[in-house]
Amino acid sequence: MNEVSVIKEGWLHKRGEYIKTWRPRYFLLKSDGSFIGYKERPEAPDQTLPPLNNFSVAECQLMKTERPRPNTFVIRCLQWTTVIERTFHVDSPDEREEWMRAIQMVANSLKQRGPGEDAMDYKCGSPSDSSTSEMMEVAVNKARAKVTMNDFDYLKLLGKGTFGKVILVREKATGRYYAMKILRKEVIIAKDEVAHTVTESRVLQNTRHPFLTALKYAFQTHDRLCFVMEYANGGELFFHLSRERVFTEDRARFYGAEIVSALEYLHSRDVVYRDIKLENLMLDKDGHIKITDFGLCKEGISDGATMKTFCGTPEYLAPEVLEDNDYGRAVDWWGLGVVMYEMMCGRLPFYNQDHERLFELILMEEIRFPRTLGPEAKSLLAGLLKKDPKQRLGGGPSDAKEVMEHRFFLSINWQDVVQKKLLPPFKPQVTSEVDTRYFDDEFTAQSITITPPDRYDSLDPLELDQRTHFPQFSYSASIRE
């Protein structure tokens, strides 16, 4: 067991992920890859004071830029299948070089340790991400045959964003249908500024839960990263709610219970999902919930390595996320509160087109309920949408149990939930696996344009050079089935 030591420490200015202000943080970079930020300089490196920022530099990509401030550097990596960034600046070019060299050295040493050694549970991102080792293990495809683009028929476009697209595909060998998320490498790699790139996929290898989308394969082409995931064709919950405007409390209770069951499973494995929102909640063909990771940045990335525009759905952000403080499992209970409020009230709990005003509402505004809402539902939502994560329902040490024991869920048998014994309140009227009536025809009506598959199997040396940014980015579920 290697002893963890502090490699470098000092003051950095960290840019808020959402409220784009710069905050001074005292950071410790440790030999195990952890990169921990405090409001004040800690008296001792091993002190128990909780940090405000806690993530890992293992297998990250480093970039430097002079925007939006001189001497800025960016740490970028994949969180599940979504690109995330953290931005810092220092006072001088020399100081920036020192930090980048130190981070690079730690990342390299972790990479060289090899499987089974200390600190090989590659983690990245925020505090919640940094404990996702079980679901983000290094994936090396030892399957008998390598998966390529040629192995699939491309049927319909399901979604599209700045980073890439999600396509309904059919695996030729088995006839099975999947959703393939295709990310363009050029938006993940800032070509001339890469000091170190993501070198292995962090994938949802070990998820085994009825309400979580499973990953079947991950592979790459010369210019794409591809994730082949379970396909749920009942459509987004967002699609159904926008049609019906509001769900009955019973219907919301059913969906809420399945989401709680999935979150309990993730939290028991020290994984915080972080992104509960209607668009990430799908229905399968029978009407059960499937939490997906199809997230595509809809608002885009402007030019420059660090110019990340607001990407994501700000209406769902918890107060502690906005304040850029360390956050844990309670962030998921806030997300549950927002989606259940939408289901039962027909609108978001906090909304304003102006992001700054919206953030103010999330941080300060008291929650309001329609008169038609029952007392148990009001009590549940008020508990889930408490501003202080420590006071929030589910924010205590018993986590999901607190939520499960709330009187709103009194009629729910949780064993029956996980065993799918409860009858879904709505069964999607799909006629076949390729029936996409519950997907937005803005996408499904479009023709699919991807580079012809044969292009991927005859890479020239220049194209192979780009592949070296993502060595061993491959995975097949069959190796553990």
From Swiss-Prot:
Known outcome of mutating S474A: Decreased phosphorylation leading to decreased activity
First-level EC class: transferase
CC annotations in GO: cell cortex; cytoplasm; cytosol; early endosome; nucleoplasm; plasma membrane; ruffle membrane
Domain AGC-kinase C-terminal: 410-481
Known glycosylation sites: S128, S131, T306, T313, S474
Active site: D275
Record note on modification: Phosphorylation on Thr-309 and Ser-474 is required for full activity. Phosphorylation of the activation loop at Thr-309 by PDPK1/PDK1 is a prerequisite for full activation. Phosphorylated and activated by PDPK1/PDK1 in the presence of phosphatidylinositol 3,4,5-trisphosphate. Phosphorylation by mTORC2 in response to growth factors plays a key role in AKT1 activation: mTORC2 phosphorylates different sites depending on the context, such as Ser-474 or Ser-478, thereby facilitating subsequent phosphorylation of the activation loop by PDPK1/PDK1.
An annotated GO BP: glycogen biosynthetic process
Boundaries of every Protein kinase domain copy: 152-409
Topological type in the membrane: Peripheral membrane protein
Record's keyword annotation contains Hydrolase: no
Localization, UniProt: Cytoplasm; Nucleus; Cell membrane; Early endosome
Keywords: Acetylation, Apoptosis, ATP-binding, Carbohydrate metabolism, Cell membrane, Cytoplasm, Developmental protein, Disulfide bond, Endosome, Glucose metabolism, Glycogen biosynthesis, Glycogen metabolism, Glycoprotein, Kinase, Manganese, Membrane, Metal-binding, Nucleotide-binding, Nucleus, Phosphoprotein, Serine/threonine-protein kinase, Sugar transport, Transferase, Translation regulation, Transport, Ubl conjugation
EC code: 2.7.11.1
Effect of mutating W80A: Abolished inhbition by MK2206
Annotated Mn(2+) binding sites: N280, D293
Domain comment, as recorded: Binding of the PH domain to phosphatidylinositol 3,4,5-trisphosphate (PtdIns(3,4,5)P3) following phosphatidylinositol 3-kinase alpha (PIK3CA) activation results in AKT2 recruitment to the plasma membrane, exposition of a pair of serine and threonine residues for phosphorylation by membrane-associated PDPK1/PDK1 and activation.
Name listed for the protein in its UniProt record: RAC-beta serine/threonine-protein kinase
Organism: Mus musculus
Gene behind this protein: Akt2
